[in-house]
Amino acid sequence: MEPIFVGKGTEYRKKYDNYVEILKERLTEKRFFHSLSVAKEALRLAEKYGAEPEKAFLTGLLHDICKDEEPKRQLQLLNEFGIMLDNVEKGAKKLWHARSGAVYIREILKINDPEIISAVRYHTTARKGMSLLEKIVYLADFTSEDRDYEGVEDMRKAVDVSLEY
């Protein structure tokens, strides 16, 4: 099952079919749907706030590429490419997928756009001084159509007013 794309979303979904196929292999069905939903929402927010729509779509699509990877494999990937976790990060396994995902995108998929890599890296923790793309992906992950936590509708309304909340 996939979200329904319209307009540029349909075009980008076709253009990045190779990445979609990789995601199908790497992610559970639920996480795959989530990744497509985040891509859709990131595209919408990019169009609304003046970011690059295609870059936002691609980043949203790939943001959880390592989420379903075993923690041991995530650590191996990080170590293989010289990324060492600090003591705080070592204790937060649920956040490793953002670091390993950024490495995977750069080293395995050969996407060398620093903005995309950074947006994937910080999509779980955020950071001070986030770029527009980082904010969009962070908030798209939080408000995508598959999310159903208490207060999500309020968050969706808020991101339609500003990305600065």
Positions of predicted regions on the chain:
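Charged, low-complexity surface segments at secondary-structure and domain boundaries
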Residues: 1-8, 153-159
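Generic N-terminal amphipathic, Lys/Arg-enriched alpha-helix
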Residues: 2-27
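Divalent metal-dependent catalytic cores for phosphoryl transfer on phosphate-bearing substrates
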Residues: 21-25, 45-164
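N-terminal glycine-rich anion-binding loops that anchor highly charged ligand groups
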Residues: 33-34
